[in-house]
Amino acid sequence: MEKKLRTASICVQGGYQPKNGERIEVPIIQSTTFKYDNSEEKAMLFDLKKEGYFYTRLQNPTNDAVAQKIAQLEGGVGAVLTSSGQAANFYAVFNICEAGDHIVTSNEIYGGTFNLFGVTLKKLGIECTFVNPNDSEEEIQKAFRPNTKVVFGETISNPGCAVLDIEKFARIAHKNGVPLIVDNTFATPINCRPFEWGADIVTHSTTKYMDGTASQVGGVVVDSGNFDWMANAEKFPGLCTPDDSYHGLTYVKAFGKMGYTTKLVAQLMRDLGSIPAPMNSFILNLGLQSLHLRMRQHCENAQKVAEFLHNDPRVAWVHYSGLKDDTYYELAQKYMPNGTCGVIAFGLRGDRETAIKFMDSLDMINIVTHVADARTCVLHPASHTHRQLTDEQLKEAGVAPDLIRLSVGIEDVEDILDDIKQALDKI
């Protein structure tokens, strides 16, 4: 049945099929551990010779059902839920890389991920080179080293709203024998499925559109199952050589297309944790059931708001790839012809203080450290999410000092516009 389901049906019924007499909603298995009748059966679980559950830090039925739904939405072979989007990006990379390795990433990425790659991974011995995603393939190629193991980008960047040329990045990654990881948080699988354009691994902050209600923090790593790890086995010893902590088991040989996600659970979750609480996964699943409907409304509202801002003389610039004169319009039409997301980046005529005054004058629109929610939200990245970055780093990350990030919700668009208009009148 699962293979025949279309996107909207997967949102509602994917990942979990109740049997006769069972509850129709994904059950909340709020338990740390699971009972077995004999020691041998439990031992087989620890040796990865049998499927099943023994400790929620590694796997839990509620988490797995929701992860499977997201894997279906993205067209992947498997997925693992994490406790946050940051954890998802960390695990996606760290499941491949180790000390002495190097990654190449677009510089148009979320500030937290920018710090994760540029500062935290460096402490673990993993170097990172940031590239301009708009550069030519030849220019980006210069960033690669013999020890490069991963290429990373965001489908739609946070907060700059740049659209990644996924096919170009996939070509460059595969030319160098490494996988492409794409953070698909803003587009969601409703509007873009990166695997169809050559990406190998997809991540999400499920806190955002997938939840849609600001009720839980979470993330997910989804594997396409398409990358041939053994073709460049020397680059990926963690996946292609025996793991001493599992009696010499080799993940790719033992689990095939599921080798990547199996290693993430069996090794990283075992050693580092970061699994979501089953209750959070249950809440996430409730959000997923309406994702296809909400994304349509987000995009419709954002298009109208972007057009209004674009035509207002008090607005200096607008970045929204649904606008025909936007730099990324053609890429958006290629990868997301049915809509991009509800996030708009724009700047007002004036200085940094003008942006702050505008935000402080808003009434219905919320100033919060959040984005991609049912409620319309606003933030000044240079003062908030990217506050730790220097002016040079802000420039490198594509964050202008006057940039305002407006996350358009699913309220009545006329109410959203009324609030923006009255705030503009006060600057």
Predicted features, each with a name:
Residues 2, 8-17, 79-311:
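Conserved PLP-enzyme active-site core in the AAT-like
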Residues 2-60, 68:
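N-terminal "arm"/small-domain region of PLP-dependent enzymes with the aminotransferase-like
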Residues 33, 223-227, 348-351:
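Short loop segments at secondary-structure junctions
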Residues 38-90, 112-120:
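Conserved N-terminal alpha-helix of the aminotransferase class I/II PLP-enzyme fold
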Residues 75, 147, 314-317, 364, ...:
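Glycine-centered tight turns that cap/initiate beta-strands
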Residues 118-119, 127-128, 142, 146-149, ...:
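PLP-dependent enzyme catalytic core of the Aspartate aminotransferase-like
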Residues 222, 345-347, 407-409:
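Short hydrophobic/aromatic beta-strand micro-patches
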Residues 272-275, 279-281, 286, 290, ...:
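Conserved small-domain helix->loop->beta segment predominantly found in fold-type I
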